[in-house]
Swiss-Prot record:
Organism listed in the record: Rattus norvegicus
Cellular compartments per GO CC: cytoplasmic vesicle; extracellular space
Compartments in which it is found: Secreted; Zymogen granule lumen
Keywords of this entry: Carboxypeptidase, Cytoplasmic vesicle, Disulfide bond, Hydrolase, Metal-binding, Metalloprotease, Protease, Secreted, Signal, Zinc, Zymogen
Cofactor field: Zn(2+)
Domain Peptidase M14 residue range list: 116-410
Cofactor remark from the record: Binds 1 zinc ion per subunit.
Leader sequence residues: 1-13
Ligand binding (substrate): 174-177, 232, 249-250, 303-304, 354
Binding site for Zn(2+): 174, 177, 302
Family that this chain belongs to: Belongs to the peptidase M14 family.
Protein name, entry field: Carboxypeptidase B
A Pfam family: Propep_M14
Amino acid sequence: MLLLLALVSVALAHASEEHFDGNRVYRVSVHGEDHVNLIQELANTKEIDFWKPDSATQVKPLTTVDFHVKAEDVADVENFLEENEVHYEVLISNVRNALESQFDSHTRASGHSYTKYNKWETIEAWIQQVATDNPDLVTQSVIGTTFEGRNMYVLKIGKTRPNKPAIFIDCGFHAREWISPAFCQWFVREAVRTYNQEIHMKQLLDELDFYVLPVVNIDGYVYTWTKDRMWRKTRSTMAGSSCLGVRPNRNFNAGWCEVGASRSPCSETYCGPAPESEKETKALADFIRNNLSTIKAYLTIHSYSQMMLYPYSYDYKLPENYEELNALVKGAAKELATLHGTKYTYGPGATTIYPAAGGSDDWSYDQGIKYSFTFELRDTGFFGFLLPESQIRQTCEETMLAVKYIANYVREHLY
């Protein structure tokens, strides 16, 4: 079957109402509380899209802050920083150019590709196809629907056997983190492709099941392709507010809305009106609750920062098995680096990246899943959320090593 080809520029014309031409992404060095106050002042006077950390309230001394500024505010922001002697560098000088550079060719096939970013419709068709093509290893089920009525699919990967221990992996919590769903697709492909070729994969799939949720926030993901590439929240409506969406990784009942989250519907860190208020988070949580007897590990895949995190993020307390979790991610990070030399940092969420309540990894850990981790994939900020397709293969290859390392440890340390 011949694949239809379309110009990337045409696709991009439909991908966003905001063209981002002239927009910039900055990295600011925060030395002390005076700099923290200046960043918060800037956020109060200009429309700042924080990339890392998630909001002005999470800025702290002796860190760096990455944020995205609209073209009309660039001059004012740079003048403000210079007048206050705040050091900054421009990570992306024109966001529009970076958007176009995500795609590694001027033409793209309409079919599915593991080394391209795929639209939701393409991913959905792939889900059906991969289950049809691999009936001995893959089954698909619908665990719920999104706010806009799209089916949420989970793929169960493993050799059929009753009551097998399982590992749950989800991708695409935040809509603009396109590399995340790309990894879930890659994981499924490699699992079925290497089952009869690699003894370690065969052992994993014979002894464990893997539940893979390729895209959690489907509505938001679709919106990044059709309207606004920088969207991150869900697309639900709120009574009494014109602002849409909830930050899904602030919507779980784990220190809900206590820190690193907002009760304002217009905030990018809005925690929602209640825990699990979002159809997407409720469906995910219900599935895990219904399978708690078998799920032994939980991995949620995000970007960016090159980090492996474990609980807690909503509190500075350490988990009971802190030493075990730290040793495990240390080994996984070392394994990941063997392929392309990519360096990951690791540790508890609150101290390693920033405090944030309502996360799915903290929630799953508190449900009794003692191997619960968040991956923050490539890169460390040069491309940020706009990682080029040319890096998909390497990112997924190295992440696969880390995930298999953790999975094998879980297989050997069942509880």
